[in-house]
Protein backbone atom coordinates (compact mmCIF):
# COMPACT_ATOMS: atom_id res chain seq x y z
CA UNK A 1 0.00 0.00 0.00
CA UNK A 2 1.54 3.34 -1.04
CA UNK A 3 2.33 6.03 1.53
CA UNK A 4 1.13 9.49 0.57
CA UNK A 5 2.82 12.51 2.13
CA UNK A 6 1.33 15.98 1.78
CA UNK A 7 4.14 18.48 2.12
CA UNK A 8 4.10 22.14 3.04
CA UNK A 9 6.24 24.59 1.07
CA UNK A 10 9.85 24.22 2.16
CA UNK A 11 9.09 21.29 4.48
CA UNK A 12 12.06 19.01 5.14
CA UNK A 13 11.96 15.29 5.76
CA UNK A 14 14.35 12.37 5.90
CA UNK A 15 13.92 9.65 3.29
CA UNK A 16 16.11 6.57 3.80
CA UNK A 17 18.76 8.70 5.48
CA UNK A 18 18.77 11.54 2.95
CA UNK A 19 17.47 14.98 3.94
CA UNK A 20 14.97 16.14 1.31
CA UNK A 21 13.26 19.52 1.10
CA UNK A 22 10.02 20.32 -0.69
CA UNK A 23 10.01 23.24 -3.12
CA UNK A 24 8.18 26.55 -2.73
CA UNK A 25 4.69 25.07 -3.23
CA UNK A 26 2.63 22.45 -1.49
CA UNK A 27 3.51 19.03 -2.79
CA UNK A 28 2.48 15.42 -2.59
CA UNK A 29 4.92 12.54 -2.48
CA UNK A 30 3.73 8.97 -3.01
CA UNK A 31 6.05 6.19 -1.90
CA UNK A 32 5.29 2.91 -3.62
CA UNK A 33 7.45 0.66 -1.44
CA UNK A 34 8.80 0.47 2.13
CA UNK A 35 11.03 3.37 3.08
CA UNK A 36 12.08 5.15 6.26
CA UNK A 37 10.43 8.57 6.19
CA UNK A 38 10.45 11.07 9.02
CA UNK A 39 9.07 14.60 8.90
CA UNK A 40 11.10 17.53 10.15
CA UNK A 41 8.82 17.97 13.19
CA UNK A 42 9.60 14.41 14.33
CA UNK A 43 13.38 14.70 13.94
CA UNK A 44 15.35 15.21 17.14
CA UNK A 45 18.99 16.25 17.32
CA UNK A 46 21.25 14.60 19.91
CA UNK A 47 21.60 17.85 21.88
CA UNK A 48 17.79 17.96 22.23
CA UNK A 49 17.69 14.59 24.03
CA UNK A 50 17.89 16.30 27.41
CA UNK A 51 15.18 14.53 29.42
CA UNK A 52 14.54 10.86 30.23
CA UNK A 53 11.71 10.48 27.69
CA UNK A 54 13.69 12.26 24.99
CA UNK A 55 16.63 9.95 25.74
CA UNK A 56 14.30 7.06 24.88
CA UNK A 57 12.95 8.75 21.75
CA UNK A 58 16.37 9.54 20.27
CA UNK A 59 17.78 5.98 20.00
CA UNK A 60 14.41 4.73 18.72
CA UNK A 61 14.51 7.43 16.04
CA UNK A 62 18.05 6.40 15.10
CA UNK A 63 17.00 2.74 14.89
CA UNK A 64 14.17 3.74 12.57
CA UNK A 65 16.33 5.90 10.33
CA UNK A 66 19.18 3.38 10.14
CA UNK A 67 17.65 -0.07 10.60
CA UNK A 68 20.78 -1.79 9.30
CA UNK A 69 22.67 -0.49 12.35
CA UNK A 70 19.83 -0.62 14.89
CA UNK A 71 21.82 -2.82 17.27
CA UNK A 72 24.21 0.07 17.86
CA UNK A 73 21.37 2.06 19.43
CA UNK A 74 19.62 -0.79 21.22
CA UNK A 75 21.72 -0.80 24.40
CA UNK A 76 21.16 2.94 24.93
CA UNK A 77 17.44 2.48 24.31
CA UNK A 78 17.17 -0.45 26.74
CA UNK A 79 19.11 1.38 29.46
CA UNK A 80 17.05 4.56 29.15
CA UNK A 81 13.72 2.71 29.02
CA UNK A 82 14.64 0.65 32.10
CA UNK A 83 15.60 3.81 34.00
CA UNK A 84 12.36 5.54 32.98
CA UNK A 85 10.21 2.57 33.96
CA UNK A 86 11.98 2.44 37.33
CA UNK A 87 10.65 5.85 38.35
CA UNK A 88 7.28 6.09 36.60
CA UNK A 89 4.24 4.90 38.54
CA UNK A 90 1.48 5.68 36.03
CA UNK A 91 0.13 2.30 34.81
CA UNK A 92 -0.88 3.70 31.40
CA UNK A 93 2.60 5.07 30.81
CA UNK A 94 4.17 1.79 31.93
CA UNK A 95 1.89 -0.03 29.46
CA UNK A 96 3.14 2.31 26.72
CA UNK A 97 6.74 1.56 27.75
CA UNK A 98 6.12 -2.18 27.42
CA UNK A 99 4.49 -1.65 24.02
CA UNK A 100 7.46 0.45 22.87
CA UNK A 101 9.82 -2.33 23.91
CA UNK A 102 7.75 -4.94 22.07
CA UNK A 103 7.72 -2.80 18.91
CA UNK A 104 11.50 -2.37 19.07
CA UNK A 105 12.00 -6.11 19.55
CA UNK A 106 9.76 -6.74 16.52
CA UNK A 107 11.79 -4.15 14.54
CA UNK A 108 8.65 -2.01 14.23
CA UNK A 109 10.65 1.12 14.91
CA UNK A 110 8.17 3.62 13.48
CA UNK A 111 5.42 2.34 15.78
CA UNK A 112 7.83 2.51 18.72
CA UNK A 113 8.83 6.04 17.72
CA UNK A 114 5.28 7.35 17.56
CA UNK A 115 4.46 5.75 20.92
CA UNK A 116 7.63 7.29 22.38
CA UNK A 117 6.16 10.70 21.59
CA UNK A 118 3.48 9.92 24.19
CA UNK A 119 6.22 9.52 26.81
CA UNK A 120 7.52 12.99 25.94
CA UNK A 121 3.99 14.42 26.22
CA UNK A 122 3.52 12.73 29.60
CA UNK A 123 6.87 13.99 30.81
CA UNK A 124 6.15 17.54 29.62
CA UNK A 125 2.81 17.52 31.47
CA UNK A 126 4.42 16.24 34.66
CA UNK A 127 7.32 18.68 34.50
CA UNK A 128 5.22 21.61 33.32
CA UNK A 129 7.07 22.06 30.02
CA UNK A 130 5.33 23.80 27.16
CA UNK A 131 5.61 21.98 23.83
Curated annotation (Swiss-Prot):
Protein family: Belongs to the FlbT family.
InterPro entries, per database record: Flagellum_FlbT
Biological process, per Gene Ontology: bacterial-type flagellum organization; mRNA catabolic process; negative regulation of bacterial-type flagellum assembly
Domain of life according to the entry: Bacteria
Listed name of the protein: Probable flagellum biosynthesis repressor protein FlbT
Disulfide bonds: none
GO molecular function list: mRNA 5'-UTR binding
One matching Pfam family: FlbT
Amino acid sequence: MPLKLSLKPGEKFVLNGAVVQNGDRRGVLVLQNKASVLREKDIMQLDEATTPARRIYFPVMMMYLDEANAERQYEEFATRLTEFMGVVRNPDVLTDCIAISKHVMAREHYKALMLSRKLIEYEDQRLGHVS
